[in-house]
Amino acid sequence: MARKIISYNPLKQKRPSILGKKTKRVSDISSKVTQKVIFELNDSLDRLITKYGILNGIGLAAPQINSNLRIAVIQLPKKRVVMINPKVIKKSKDSAVSAICCFSVQRYCGNIEHPKRIKIFYLDEKGKKRTYSVPKKNSV
């Protein structure tokens, strides 16, 4: 079942503490807690895709559903990626500016400067080591 996505209006409210805390590294991918968070992130992402019709580049991180685990789920053009313990291992020095919207900050879309290219190391939901490179303005 999809969890409610934590959101707030920065003009009226303080940021919920879970959104500013450092996440905890996942040590047991097969644990019930980890699997539940992965399921709920996927379910919540499905709900957002249905509601907004966005299919590419939309994603959620565990703190957005009130979990402090280091997990993110991202919808790419042809597949969905579950990233456990993701870490940026390389980023370009050149940058780009893109319009970004955040589901946790109500009504916030803005131009954000970010590296043009990044490389992320992560574990997939089966524990396999993976890397993913974002070559264009779609940097996460």
Residue ranges of each PLM-predicted region?
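Positively charged
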Residues: 1-140
